[in-house]
């Protein structure tokens, strides 16, 4: 457990933050530049903890070490990413850093290995000393807590691990974060804590303080119109692991073929993966689409390989990504995060945004970052494009999301 305050010049009793983004291609310089920029913004205040999001073109462990050396802070968590961002914009092949000086807080870092083969044990490792931290916070009258979780996004057990985290922390624990991603052509995602980085793992930062962190989510995806040949609601009639074999008793991929035809798209090997990713599945709860799932590939029998399991009998539809709607949704998520600060001033913002949204928006993704920035002007921000978004807070019980913008506001 670490106290939020640290020795150094001019301690203040409110949270302050600084961010940095480096587009330098050389790993031995990118982390240094991003950390130097973030440290400069703190104006001499010592960071309590921080976040490092790096393209897999950079060595994540090396980036963590560079940030630690420059900032003097080793309480860092990080992830590889499909794109990096700060309040200055969006980049690929970059390193993004957020350093937070939080004197009125206590926090704890944890690392959990073997996510694929032992997700329950991974979650237990991430929360092993959570109750001890909670007891310390209670003794100081600090009731609010948030867990930032980063997981290997190429593991198919992320959602199950998160459900175990819910059991290992406390009822209605607020949990945010994202699943580490990769650039096209790379196949190993990593998460990191302090000076180590590993695939097939998870990391956590648990923070307790006197003020609630604000969280907001939205996706802006739209269901098909009644005029289209794809049903507004389809039933998952056969599921094998995380593969949807059948929708309404037919090979699941047939629904996407009909959807593509409605949009004058001819699906082939060269575009099917992108079409699946940018037109994800919406999952209904009663008559409301409550979650989104991405199918990343198709099996030889027409099954859809998803990022997480769905229960047989689930009702789903195929959603469409209109760029304007995506950008507006990010703005709404930011507004919700600001509202959920309950009147507190924001010190920093984290943005966990899906890689599929980056793919759908392309060069326009800067506009999504700007939509968040418009709600939080002059507030340091960092984030990354994920392979799955994590947000469980008041009003939202399901922690795992796809194709969604998650905005997290850290209060002063």
Give residue spans per PLM region.
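Small-residue-enriched flexible segments
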Residues: 2-49, 53-70, 74-75, 79-348, ...
């Amino acid at each position: 457990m670490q106290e939020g305050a640290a020795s150094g010049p001019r301690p203040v009793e409110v949270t302050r933050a600084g961010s940095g983004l480096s587009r330098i291609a050389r790993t031995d310089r990118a982390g240094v530049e991003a950390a130097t920029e973030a440290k400069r913004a703190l104006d001499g205040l010592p960071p309590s903890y921080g976040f490092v999001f790096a393209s897999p073109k950079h060595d994540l462990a090396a980036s963590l070490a560079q940030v630690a050396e420059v900032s003097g802070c080793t309480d860092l968590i990080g992830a590889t990413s499909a794109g990096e961002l700060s309040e200055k914009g969006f980049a690929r092949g970059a390193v993004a850093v957020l350093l937070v000086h939080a004197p009125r807080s206590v926090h704890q870092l944890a690392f959990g290995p073997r996510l694929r083969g032992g997700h329950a044990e991974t979650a237990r490792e991430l929360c092993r000393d959570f109750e001890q931290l909670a007891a310390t916070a209670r003794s100081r009258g600090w009731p609010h807590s948030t867990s930032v979780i980063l997981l290997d996004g190429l593991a198919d057990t992320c959602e199950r691990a998160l459900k175990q985290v819910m059991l290992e922390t406390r009822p209605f624990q607020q949990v945010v974060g994202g699943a580490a991603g990769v650039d096209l052509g790379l196949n190993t995602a990593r998460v990191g804590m302090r000076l180590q980085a590993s695939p097939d793992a998870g990391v956590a930062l648990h923070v307790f303080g006197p003020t609630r962190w604000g969280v907001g989510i939205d996706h802006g995806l739209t269901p098909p119109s009644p005029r289209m040949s794809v049903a507004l609601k389809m039933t998952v009639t056969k599921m094998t692991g995380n593969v949807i074999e059948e929708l309404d008793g037919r090979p699941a991929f047939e629904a996407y073929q009909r959807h593509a035809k409605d949009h004058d798209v001819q699906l082939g090997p060269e575009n099917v993966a992108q079409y699946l990713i940018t037109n994800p599945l919406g999952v209904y709860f009663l008559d409301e689409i409550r979650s989104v799932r991405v199918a990343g590939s198709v099996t030889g029998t027409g099954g859809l390989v998803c990022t997480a399991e769905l229960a047989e009998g689930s009702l789903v539809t195929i959603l469409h990504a209109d760029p304007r709607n995506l950008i507006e949704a990010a703005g709404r998520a930011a507004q919700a995060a600001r509202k959920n600060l309950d009147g507190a001033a924001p010190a920093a913002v984290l943005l966990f945004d899906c890689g599929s949204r980056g793919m759908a928006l392309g060069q326009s993704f800067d506009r999504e970052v700007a939509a968040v920035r418009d709600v939080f002007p002059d507030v340091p921000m960092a984030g990354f494009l994920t392979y799955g978004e994590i947000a469980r807070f008041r009003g939202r019980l399901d922690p795992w999301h796809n194709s969604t913008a998650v905005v997290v506001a850290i209060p002063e």
